[in-house]
């Protein structure tokens, strides 16, 4: 039997080491803007990419009090931070944002950065709450969509 421990002990939302099942659940239930960002913005298949991330084992998933998986996140080499979410974040929006901040604040990297599809309003709002600064717009991916570096 595998016992999972919270990486961060939040009051309502559990942040746990990723499992293959959680990665598949997130990929199957992505917010529409997150799916669009992965597919149109990066030219990638969310299921393939999230399963690959789970197999690498360096990311976490967020589990809300009603048992739903709200998303998964990770930090890759060089401080590249990412998060993809399901609609479960809307069931506990304030708590989710606070726990996401605790996750970001717990990281040891000197710098966390990435790019975000400028159409992804939920993530832009969350990134601002998390304390990231928006640096510049760039064209990115196979469709040369407008992304914002943070």
Model-derived features: positions:
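Conserved acyl-CoA
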Residues: 98-112, 121, 130-132
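Conserved beta-hairpin
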Residues: 56-72
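A short, internal acetyl-CoA/4′-phosphopantetheine-binding micro-motif in the GNAT/acyltransferase core
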Residues: 82-98
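Conserved beta-strand-loop-alpha-helix junction that forms the acyl-donor binding cleft
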Residues: 112-128, 139-143
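N-terminal secretory/targeting leader peptides
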Residues: 4, 134-135
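Active-site rim helix/loop that mediates acceptor-substrate recognition in acyltransferases
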Residues: 38-58
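Short amphipathic alpha-helix that is part of the acyltransferase structural core
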Residues: 2-44
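A conserved beta-strand-loop-helix scaffold within acyl/acetyltransferase catalytic domains
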Residues: 73-79, 136
């Amino acid at each position: 039997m595998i016992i999972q421990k919270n990486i961060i002990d939040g009051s309502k939302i559990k942040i746990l080491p990723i499992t293959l099942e959680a990665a598949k659940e997130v990929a199957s239930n992505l917010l529409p803007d997150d799916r669009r960002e992965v597919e149109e913005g990066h030219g990638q298949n969310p299921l393939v990419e999230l399963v690959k991330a789970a197999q690498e084992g360096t990311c976490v998933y967020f589990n809300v009090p009603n048992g739903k998986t709200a998303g998964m996140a990770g930090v890759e080499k060089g401080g590249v931070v990412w998060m993809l979410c399901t609609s479960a974040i809307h069931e506990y929006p304030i708590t989710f944002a606070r726990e996401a901040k605790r996750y970001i604040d717990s990281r040891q990297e000197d710098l966390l950065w990435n790019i975000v599809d400028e159409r992804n309003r939920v993530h832009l709002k969350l990134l601002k709450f998390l304390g990231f600064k928006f640096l510049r717009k760039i064209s990115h991916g196979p469709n040369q969509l407008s992304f914002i570096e943070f």
